[in-house]
UniProtKB/Swiss-Prot annotation:
GO biological process: cytoplasmic translation
Similarity comment: family membership: Belongs to the universal ribosomal protein uL6 family.
UniProt GO molecular function: rRNA binding; structural constituent of ribosome
Keyword Lipid metabolism carried by entry: no
Gene Ontology CC annotations of this record: cytosolic large ribosomal subunit
Gene this protein is translated from: rplF
Keyword Nucleotide-binding: no
Gene3D superfamilies linked to this entry: Ribosomal protein L6, alpha-beta domain
Subunit structure: Part of the 50S ribosomal subunit.
Organism: Neisseria meningitidis serogroup B (strain ATCC BAA-335 / MC58)
Keywords, alphabetical: Ribonucleoprotein, Ribosomal protein, RNA-binding, rRNA-binding
Protein name according to UniProt: Large ribosomal subunit protein uL6
Entries under PANTHER family matching the protein: 60S/50S RIBOSOMAL PROTEIN L6/L9 (PTHR11655), LARGE RIBOSOMAL SUBUNIT PROTEIN UL6M (PTHR11655:SF14)
Length: 177
């Protein structure tokens, strides 16, 4: 049995778990997420805890039971608490402005960048150089943050660009004459 799958997922109050024909549906205050059931993994729901057991002793079944447990754990946390990613813009003239589901970025290009948020992700800009992304799906929030960062990744000489809050950019030394 997978070491990760040995620990059950505790379902907090206010989170509803339903087993469908082909998917596990988790509903909470932040929305609803579904997880497709895998044939190698059996999921049991007893006393507010979800347990994951491999249906056979193959390596793939063990791996899938741990993967399923990790993904469902993130879904339970997402629908109850939510996930947040913070980005900061470093550089002269680099600005961000949120207008509903649209993020306008000025990153030193000759044109502004207009990024439309996917379903389930909301954006806020507390200041012109800070972006806060929130949502219930950890994968989607992380993907959106990575796509925004990729517009102007931090460069290694001055550190200018879009970076995660707390990210350490290793700086290079300038060429010497």
């Amino acid at each position: 049995m997978s070491r990760v799958a040995k620990n059950p997922v505790t379902v907090p109050a206010g989170v509803e778990v339903k087993f469908g024909a082909e998917a596990l549906v988790i509903k909470g205050k932040n929305g609803e997420l579904s997880f497709p059931l895998h044939s190698d993994v059996a999921i049991e729901f007893n006393d507010g805890k979800l347990t994951f057991v491999a249906n056979n002793s193959s390596k793939q079944a063990n791996a899938m039971s741990g993967t399923a447990r990790a993904l469902v754990s993130n879904m339970v946390k997402g629908v109850s608490e939510g996930f947040e990613k913070r980005l900061q813009l470093i550089g002269v003239g680099y600005r961000a402005q949120a207008q509903g589901k649209i993020l306008n970025l000025s990153l030193g290009f000759s044109h502004p960048i207009v990024y439309e948020m996917p379903e389930g992700v909301s954006v806020q800009t507390p200041s012109q150089t800070e972006i806060v992304l929130t949502g219930s799906d950890k994968q989607v929030v992380g993907q959106v943050a990575a796509e925004i960062r990729a517009f102007r990744a931090p460069e290694p000489y001055k550190g200018k660009g879009v970076r995660y809050v707390g990210e350490v950019v290793v700086m290079k030394e300038a060429k010497k004459k």
